[in-house]
């Protein structure tokens, strides 16, 4: 069973048992999350828009992504600024699509 689910304003096409990285969730590692905003459900042959479908997932861990370096400069003024940013992600495992 596959489903197109919206998690934190981003859409993911998920299957049972799949692990994926989503934007940081407000839960602790080991907690069970339920996503009720399912946009599409498919069983391989047919797809349906089921409003009663839910996706259950287990939060495995919180991690940070790769570092992105931001560099700003103004010419002839000796102005240079370097900043770094690491986006936070949560790793989840899809338990069921029902």
From Swiss-Prot:
InterPro entries per the UniProt record, alphabetical: bL21-like (IPR028909), bL21-like_sf (IPR036164), Ribosomal_bL21 (IPR001787), Ribosomal_bL21_CS (IPR018258)
Tell whether Cytoplasm is among the UniProt keywords: no
Gene Ontology molecular function, alphabetical: rRNA binding; structural constituent of ribosome
Q: Which UniProt keywords apply?
A: Ribonucleoprotein, Ribosomal protein, RNA-binding, rRNA-binding
A Pfam family reported for this protein in Swiss-Prot or TrEMBL: Ribosomal_L21p
Name the GO cellular-component terms.
Answer: cytoplasm; ribonucleoprotein complex; ribosome
* Alphabetical list of HAMAP family matching this protein: Ribosomal_bL21 (MF_01363)
What this chain does, per the entry, is described as:
This protein binds to 23S rRNA in the presence of protein L20.
| Subunit structure as annotated in this protein's UniProt entry | Part of the 50S ribosomal subunit. Contacts protein L20.
Q: What is this protein called?
A: Large ribosomal subunit protein bL21
Q: Which organism is it from?
A: Chloroherpeton thalassium (strain ATCC 35110 / GB-78)
């Amino acid at each position: 069973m596959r489903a197109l689910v919206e998690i934190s304003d981003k859409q993911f096409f998920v299957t049972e048992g799949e692990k994926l990285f989503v934007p940081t969730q407000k839960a602790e590692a080991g907690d069970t999350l339920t996503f009720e905003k399912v946009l599409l459900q498919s069983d391989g042959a047919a797809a349906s828009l089921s409003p009663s479908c839910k996706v259950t997932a287990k939060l495995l861990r919180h991690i940070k992504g790769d570092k992105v370096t931001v560099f700003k400069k103004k010419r002839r003024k000796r102005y240079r600024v370097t900043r770094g940013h690491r986006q936070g992600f949560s790793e989840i495992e899809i338990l069921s699509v029902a």
